Amino acid sequence: MKKISSVFTMFALIAAILFSGFIPQQAYAETTLTPTATNKTASIQLTSDVHTLAVINTFDGVADYLIRYKRLPDNYITKSQASALGWVASKGNLAEVAPGKSIGGDVFSNREGRLPSASGRTWREADINYVSGFRNADRLVYSSDWLIYKTTDHYATFTRIR
């Protein structure tokens, strides 16, 4: 009789879970992990920003994200944030101290004037196609009024993509 009671209890529990609408993946999909820097140690901050779960680091992916959300994806951190985590550019250790992260969001000065200027316009840059080791020459440069350019030769030439 005890065995039948246990089987019935297990069946009731499974039925309750199935009919409650609980889907474990929903709980995961609503949680985004966002690293934040605190004195060379990384901590995790939970947010409900579903669209930033994936690493986005291609020209089109980042450009589309910028246009849609008016900010870089969460896998981007500034040079100062990376430095706080222990990044040293000359060591090429970003992937070691901030796995899955790319450098982006710092001001691009446009000193050579290769990009169009306008009153009040500022430019920012983001590394593209970074996986590990030393940063490459691919950059996306975007303006405060959402002009977006790419360079594959470390700022020698630019092509407007948005």
UniProtKB/Swiss-Prot annotation:
Q: What Enzyme Commission number(s) apply to this enzyme?
A: 3.1.27.-
Per UniProt, subcellular location reads as: Secreted
The entry lists its GO molecular-function terms as: RNA binding; RNA endonuclease activity
Gene Ontology CC: extracellular region
Keyword annotations for this protein?
Endonuclease, Hydrolase, Nuclease, Secreted, Signal
Q: Please indicate if the UniProt record lists Nucleotide-binding as a keyword.
A: no
Which residues does the entry assign to the active site, renumbered to this chain? 125 (proton acceptor), 154 (proton donor)
Q: Which InterPro entries match?
A: Barnase, N1-like, Ribonuclease/ribotoxin
UniProt KW tRNA-binding keyword: no
Q: What is the annotated signal peptide range for this record?
A: 1-29
What this chain does, per the record? This is a purine-specific ribonuclease.
This chain belongs to which protein, by name? Ribonuclease
